[in-house]
Amino acid sequence: MYSYWQSEEITKDPDLLFYLKKHYLSIDYHFRRTDGTNVKEKAKILVYYCYATPLYFFQNLIFKCQTFDNFINLFIPNLTALTEIAIDCGMYCILDALEGRSSKIEENGVTLNKGFSLTIDFASSYVKCFATKVDISLLMQYITTQLQQGDIVVSLLLNKLISKVANV
């Protein structure tokens, strides 16, 4: 269902395309204007835009969190008014961001890629914030599949989830 929302078939209607562009530009505008002093107000505004375009909102939010590491702890706790479908879209975008990573380890073979580690931090903070509402079965299935394929880097995601959500 979510991949249909990302398809170009939905943008054939000119009115819908106009409002999608308007929402996209507004989301970008409010993300650019967010700083440490107005996070609550901007989060509230962005949640309203998330009702209309949740996939674009979460893709943009994950990109911002991969770029600015302090954005995760500032922004995630303020997303309290999300609907269940928006929370589900957030999990879909997290899985998409984790799968879309071509390199998880730096070229030296030892260090984690900064974007991948920040995606892991975002995922664990997101699951902790919405622990009672989020369905993590697909995330656990992703971790299981990656571990069966021999990708042990994903065990760090499992470690972060256990340590943040379960407080172990």
Which residue stretches match the model-derived regions?
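Eukaryotic alpha-helical solenoid repeat scaffolds
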Residues: 1-168
